[in-house]
Amino acid sequence: MDPSPFTRRDFLVRSAFLAGSSALLPGYRFNIGAARPRLSETIIGQGDHRYRVELGWGDLDRATTPVENCHEMVMDSRGRLLMVTDEPRNNVLIYDKGGELLASWTLGYNAAHGLTLSEEGDEEFLYLAHNGFSDTGRVVKTTLDGRVVQTLPHPAEIGVYEADDNYHPTETAIAPNGDIYVADGYGSHWILHFSAAGEFIRRFGGRGDADEQFQTPHGITVDYRDPAGPTLLVTSRAHNAFKRFTLDGQYLSTLFLPGAFVCRPVLRGDTLYAGVCWSRLRDLNQTPNSGFVTILDRSGRVISNPGGTAPEYRNGELQLMVQETPVFKHCHDVCVDDEENLYVCQWNADRSYPIKLHRVG
């Protein structure tokens, strides 16, 4: 059971609409007293993807709107930035691009981790993955204001897992037909494929070092960039890699990113972005506080590493990438806005709020 006063059915909405907001609902409150952000002189990244760091962009009053870890962020059709945290008082914070808090809500989860935005007709929904380290993992679909509309079945309840198999989901992806893929990144390392209605279809992957297996499938997304048809990109974090699969789970290829313990792949246009939680900075080991951001072009070539060493290829092979400028501790996700600025969420970073990177090149 979560060590919070909330249950699955509990729902609490808090928001902080500023002057000019269209509505104020009961229980909403203003956000007062947050320190104003400032631009740093630091510019990070290489080539056409260089960024100026904005310090304190999303800082809030810790007494009223605390965070534990800032796990992931998405941008909705209105340009709002929705971020998931594992602080049970504030599972989702909703910002504008200026760093002002617009709203917050919670399901009381103390291990909320993955956040995926899905457009379904004229509506948008969120898929939230709850690790469930202290109780049980679950994946729920919600409206943008936090109303649960669907809960996927636990794999042990439908005979997909044995009763003692670990289930700690980290991410979801939604196919063009509405099918749902769940990455059990902190559990048994399977990708679970469900229909839009929540009916189990198949699983693939599992823990191991074969091409079609994973070591921490932390993230997953549907890649629409190939005109031949969409595919799945799945993180294999301990392998420092993304692995590509067909939508029915057939392995296609591996994109090796030496030194980079990448989180989920994030696509905008032809470009792929990812937070790097750790790099192999010391003796080729996973090093604490060594994160950065990595950016790849459509061909899978790394073109910039904000906070990291410049990408280098020798005889067509990517060389070791590590942190160079200590702007970040552990980058857990990247959100890209409509001006191609970046918002970086961090895990294990002293309960810090997101960092904004303004694109300058």
Task: Briefly describe each language-model feature range.
Residues 55-64, 149-163, 167, 201-212, ...:
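Surface-exposed loop and turn segments in beta-propeller and other repeat-based domains
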Residues 81-83, 125-127, 180-181, 231-233, ...:
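Conserved beta-propeller blade signature
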Residues 63-78, 109-122, 157-179, 209-231, ...:
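Beta-rich, blade/repeat-based domains predominating
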Residues 330-361:
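Blade-level signature of beta-propeller repeat domains, shared across WD40, Kelch, NHL, RCC1
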Residues 61, 90-93, 97-120, 131:
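Blade-loop segments of beta-propeller domains
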Residues 35-55:
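Blade/loop signatures of beta-propeller domains
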Residues 260-309:
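Loop/turn-rich, solvent-exposed surfaces of beta-rich toroidal or solenoidal domains
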Residues 2-4, 10-32:
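N-terminal export signals
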